[in-house]
Structures are given as C-alpha cells and as structure tokens.
A protein has these predicted regions:
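RNase H catalytic domain
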Residues: 4-13, 48-138
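Signature tryptophan residues that serve as conserved aromatic anchors
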Residues: 19, 107-109, 143, 184
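Short acidic, low-complexity intrinsically disordered linear motifs used
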Residues: 139-153
Length: 189
C-alpha cells in the first residue's frame, strides 16, 4: 500500500494558505499556494492534489491501494465517520470523483507537530508555500514527468488535469474519455 502524507496550513482563517503532500516511496514532494483560503480547504486540496498526481502514474494506479496520512481530523472523520460535507463542496466532489476510479483509500490520522518526520516535513512545505507564495513545486518538473510517459499515460494525465487547463488552449468540452482526448490532441497538432 502506497503511503501519502498530506498537510495544509493557513495564516489566518481565512488568509493565505499552502498545501503539501509527500509520497516517500516515489520521492515526490509537491506544494502549492492559495492567496485567500481556509485551513480546511488547504488540508483537502493536499489530498485532492495527491490523488490527482498518482492517478496519472500508471504503475501506481494499477495497485489502487493508498493510505492517506494526515493530521486533519476534518478529513479523516468526514471520510470514516460520515461527517457532513457542507463546506468546500467543490473539493469534496473532486475527491469523490478521483476515488470513483477505484482507489481503495485507508484514512489515517497522525498527530500534528509530533514525531512523524513526514508529517513535519509536509507542515514545513505547506507553511513555506504560503510564506514564499509558491504556486506549485515538484521534485520532478512537469516536463521531466511528461517525457517519461507514453502517449496513453499522457492522455490519462491530461484528462485527469483538464479542469486546471487555461481555456485559451481551445475548447475540450466534448471530451468525455481518454480516447476522445487523444483525438482532440491530434486535431490540434
């Protein structure tokens, strides 16, 4: 089972915030910054970004078993105890959508600011992201990761990340699956 450590941080609530996740087994650390947000949104964004990242990696997505380790009781209790999802619905919908691809997720709460080295590192990255206004930082550049992907893996990655693309790249509203995305990409070249 792949372990993923996630954390979010916010200066003020609301205020500038950062998120981070670490996948030690794959040597992946990713962080991001949002100008005006809440701590719960940042905690949840870290999880959504982590699942988006691994969904695009074919070798991982075949196993479909992950453990999300977070110091957010908000996330763990919502996912394991049926707490009501009445705020941050856009992120909860995205999380549900990502999980619907067959991920088997174990949700584990870890004590924050304790002796867990990966949780401490996630906190450091998340705080650093909002203090330094780091939009997105990866251990491998996007281009390095894209060059390693097959066309099919790239289509899956792109399809998973369509919601992030700037609309100036053209309309992709008719794209509903990876094969249609390949056709759309070919029509643009």
């Amino acid at each position: 089972m792949l372990k993923i450590y996630c954390d979010g941080a916010c200066s003020g609530n609301p205020g500038p915030g950062g998120w981070a996740f670490i996948i030690p087994e794959l040597n992946i650390e990713r962080t991001g910054f949002v100008d005006n947000t809440t701590n719960n949104r940042m905690e949840l964004t870290a999880v959504v970004e982590a699942l988006t990242c691994i969904s695009a990696t074919t070798s991982i997505s075949k196993t479909k078993k992950v453990e999300i380790l977070t110091d957010s009781q908000y996330i763990v209790n919502t996912m394991t105890k049926g707490w009501r999802k009445n705020k941050n619905m856009d992120l909860w919908h995205m999380l549900d959508y990502l999980i619907s691809f067959g991920w088997i997720v174990t949700w584990t709460w870890v004590k924050g600011h304790a002796d867990n080295v990966y949780n401490a590192r996630c906190d450091e990255l998340a705080v650093g992201a909002y203090k330094n206004r780091v939009v997105v930082k990866n251990t491998k550049s996007v281009w390095e990761r894209l060059k390693e992907m097959s066309v099919e893996e790239f289509a899956k990655w792109l399809y998973t990340n369509l919601y992030k693309l700037n609309s100036s790249f053209g309309s992709y509203s008719g794209v509903t699956n990876e094969s249609e995305l390949l056709k759309w990409l070919n029509s643009k070249s």
